[in-house]
Amino acid sequence: GRADYNFGYGLGRGTRKFFNGIGRWVRKTF
């Protein structure tokens, strides 16, 4: 349904932002 789609979309964006933040932290730290 639409709610499922919006949830998955938000989850995907959040996950991408999360991993981008991790990648930035890793490059800054190592």
Curated annotation (Swiss-Prot):
Q: What keywords sit in the KW lines? A: Antibiotic, Antimicrobial, Bacteriocin, Secreted
Effect of pH on activity: Activity is stable between pH 2 and 12 at 25 degrees Celsius.
Does the keyword section mention Secreted? yes
Q: Which GO terms describe its biological process?
A: defense response to bacterium; killing of cells of another organism
Q: How does activity depend on temperature?
A: Thermostable in a pH-dependent manner. Retains 100% activity after 15 minutes at 121 degrees Celsius at pH 4. Retained activity is lower when incubated at basic pH or pH 2.
Q: Which domain of life is it from?
A: Bacteria
Query: What GO CC annotations are associated with the protein?
Result: extracellular region
Could you tell me what this protein does?
Bacteriocin with activity against species of Lactobacillus, Lactococcus, Pediococcus, Leuconostoc and against B.subtilis and, to a lesser extent, against B.coagulans, B.cereus and species of Enterococcus, Listeria, Kocuria, Staphylococcus, Corynebacterium, Salmonella, Pseudomonas and Escherichia.
Q: What else is known?
A: Antimicrobial activity is lost upon treatment with alpha-chymotrypsin, trypsin, pepsin and actinase E, but not when treated with proteinase K or endoproteinase Glu-C.
Name of the featured protein: Bacteriocin plantaricin KL-1Y
Tell me which species this is from. Lactiplantibacillus plantarum (Lactobacillus plantarum)
